[in-house]
UniProtKB/Swiss-Prot annotation:
SUPFAM superfamilies: Phosphoglucomutase, C-terminal domain (SSF55957), Phosphoglucomutase, first 3 domains (SSF53738). GO terms for cellular component: cytosol. The keyword ATP-binding does not apply. This is Phosphoglucosamine mutase 2. CDD domains: GlmM. Binds 1 Mg(2+) ion per subunit. InterPro entries: A-D-PHexomutase_a/b/a-I, A-D-PHexomutase_a/b/a-I/II/III, A-D-PHexomutase_a/b/a-II, A-D-PHexomutase_a/b/a-III, A-D-PHexomutase_C, A-D-PHexomutase_C_sf, A-D-PHexomutase_CS, Alpha-D-phosphohexomutase_SF. The lineage of its organism: Bacteria, Pseudomonadati, Pseudomonadota, Gammaproteobacteria, Alteromonadales. The gene is glmM2.
Amino acid sequence: MSRKYFGTDGVRGKVGTFPITPDFAMRLGWAAGTVLASTGTKEVLIGKDTRISGYMLESAMEAGFSAAGVNVALIGPMPTPAVAYLASTFRADAGVVISASHNPFYDNGIKFFSNTGTKLNDAQELEIEALLEQALEHNALQCVASEKLGKVRRIDDAAGRYIEFCKGTFPNHLSLAGLKIVVDSAHGAAYHIAPNVYRELGAEVISINDKPNGVNINDHCGATHLDSLQSAVMIHEADLGIALDGDADRVMFVDHNGHVVDGDEILFILAQAAYQKGEMQGGVVGTLMSNLGLELALKGMDIPFVRAKVGDRYVVEQLKETGWQLGGEGSGHILSLKHASTGDGIVASLQVLKAVLESGKRLAELKAEMTKLPQVLINVRLTSGCADSILSKDSVKQAVIAAEEVLGNQGRVLLRKSGTEPLIRVMVESTDISLTQQQAEYIAQAVKVA
């Protein structure tokens, strides 16, 4: 059974347009509270990023949870992985994040974590959706008796607790003293956390894009827009730069030369560091979008590699199925189950810094030990029609077959719909950059006219 409201990363959309409305958020809070907090502490944590709409949706969710008899603990602007961690340590029944991650401020979303700090599975989301449908279609939101309504409280030391957790994933015998690091918080949820983590571990920190005003989150900054970080690293002659996205669940690096180090390269650096110390447990989980160069580099160390569906939730599922600990996506979602239950940009960055210090090499040198294959990704925005019907059209299928014949065994093609936006993503990868670009554009055009 397919999910109606939950995409690959919760519920997401444009603020003021269904389903990202106050009414929907209230009913979702009621349905989720009824399902997730039917036993246990009957309390949920709510965190958010810095979007102006977060206040509105937070209040609506509070009302829904209270109507279901569930208490709410507010932790304010907080990275998504912090909510996952704190939901577990506070013994809450669930954690709620109000964020649209790397999207612009006019989008927002709602996602849930279990009391173990993991994202909900498909069955749990379907159960919530079934109850939500009743509340939407039949106005069946049943408020508990007045004496059983949920209460709301604010937790003031949440940021400090999370900072200490992050620092605890970094070895005590190492220090960042002597490193100059530029940190780009994307005017997002980590603006008051990430710079302090690195400073408290000894680094000289230049903090940029750390002044959220409700509408500047991810605005030409952060992990999806690295130009300002690249410039800052060069201007300040820093050792490296670290970019987070709006909710700090993904991370990208810039080396001292101003060159980007993406999620695939981060996975390689972490896997190689573990391999060289004899600490590599199992293999690495990537996704269908992971660069073939990563797979080949890992193969050179006899490290197994498997591809999950795109989305960090599916990477986690594959990690648990295999019993492995390291996985992630090229976009910077890095999963290290040894340290955290979900993708954590700050924690992942600390593991990269550990690898840099222990190797005695610069980040650029570690990056250079993996050769990426040219990969072209074209996002085709849909103005009409649904992604599934377009992908099933013969003209699109024939374009893919033709491209695969041209590439032969020196490349691969992948088409997939976005789980969060009206897009079809066309990815082509091969050893020849001009051929890769040509075939990607050919397929993208077929999708546009389909």
